[in-house]
Amino acid sequence: MKKLNLFSLFLFCLSSFLPAQTTQQQPEKTPPPAARSGQEQLQKEPQGQAKPPTEKEHKITPEEATDLFRWVDQILRFASQDTGLPIKHSVKKAMVSREEVETYIGDKFKDDVDRIRFERSELVLKKFGLLPRQFNLHDFLIKLLGEQVAGYYDEKKKIINLLDWVALDMQKPVMAHELTHALQDQSFDLDKMTKKDEEIEKRGPEDPNALIKIDEQSTARTAIMEGQAMIVFADFVLNTMDGGDSCDGDAPCPIPDKRSVVDFPKFVDLMLGQMDKEKGDSLLDNAPLLLREELIFPYTRGMKFISQLLIKGGKQLAFTKVMQRMPTTSREILQPEEYLAGRVVPPLLLPDFSFLKNDFEPFDAGAVGQLDVSILLKQYTEEAVADRLSPEWRGGSYYAVGRKGAKPGDPNSTAHVGLIYVSKWASDQAAQEFAKIYASSLPERYKKVEHGTATVAGRDKYLTADGPVHIQQNGNLVIAVESFEDGVAEKLIQAVWTQQQQSQQAAAK
């Protein structure tokens, strides 16, 4: 499924990684929205704006900004030494106000293809039950970024942007993170890296397999970008937590690079564990499970992935070679041993569904990766079951179509959206278990769910307010077809099953 790329942002929630004595108390926030909804708070507060502080906050003075800017080159050198990525030119810097950040976020939301695709997927995510029906994704994301952004690197203008309301003692670690993005950009051109994906996103779901191919690649790539930056952030904290960046005189002193997460491997786990414990009253903390997991994934699991590459192959593997041979699935990020062994799960492509075009039009399509499956399982079963079953994932994709001429009175209605979801598993037993869990989710997703009569082996049929739901398990494959008439559902299932049989036969030759 499409993940939201936060444009090389550093989030306030990541500051929980900093030693407690080095962070200033942030202003108290207004009461949180209900878990998994976030809607009540959005209705009560101004929408599309960063949340104003509830107590007076310190603004960086011109003198403090000048002093911070003098550290940029020094911290850039530290990041270069830490990663092995060369400095090809200096990095421009700016101190921006809350109003300027609001403008930047607003402008990004006008035409950012990641955001446009994410919002196009909103109704499908609601059909999967991963977002509440009344949830307003656009307003939530604008408010979330207004609340959470603590610094960002603009890859188009090549500028690191510091925020004038962020505490002084957070600014240097944020710089270390964002300057890593600048180094990535200088060596690998971040803007060019995403151009092809943007072109595919703009074309929309007319070619569903094109979207399926790039979804997981984009997720993995973002995890690499943020994981590398988080490692530099961690190494900076390790080297300065005892005052290692303090010295006499006006000029910034050299930052020691004697400590690394390689030497303190448990430090990464400590940081991640601390973040798991730091549940507060922010929008992110109380967001739907899908958003919490997917927005934090690149930072947390990306950091863990890069730390494992550092241990196995040093800086060259963790910061250069991985950019030349990117992981292509969230599975490789979640299980670094899969990447290191060169084991890749290919995209699960869908057959030609052109027979739908008389009555339906393309609505959305994408991959359903191991991360997505893990979230889906956590939503509908115990976390321990999700942790055990999700590694058995071996591929997944979905295709959604809209019924032509449908004009639902409720904009959150999904009855006019037909959904085909295919998932592949390591064994028949894993597929069977997933099919049962997926079926058990239907009462939480649809109204008026009744168990119908199925006449095909391995199939369950359900009647819902959104129309019939067919769940077919054939071996290690699970096919869910939702909101289609029975005859159309049968054609869809047969098309998927025939294609998968042909793929298996071709692979066996």
Q: Each predicted region: which residue ranges?
A:
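Envelope-exposed proteins and targeting segments
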Residues: 89-91, 147-149, 156-158, 170-172, ...
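Sec-dependent N-terminal signal peptides
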Residues: 1-22
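Catalytic zinc-binding patch centered on the HExxH motif and its immediate surroundings
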Residues: 102-116, 136-157
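Extracellular zinc-dependent metalloprotease catalytic-domain scaffold
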Residues: 80, 89, 93-96, 118-134, ...
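Hydrophobic/aromatic side chains embedded in well-ordered alpha-helices
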Residues: 15, 171-175, 421
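Short pre-active-site segment immediately N-terminal to the catalytic Zn-binding motif
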Residues: 146, 158-176, 216-221
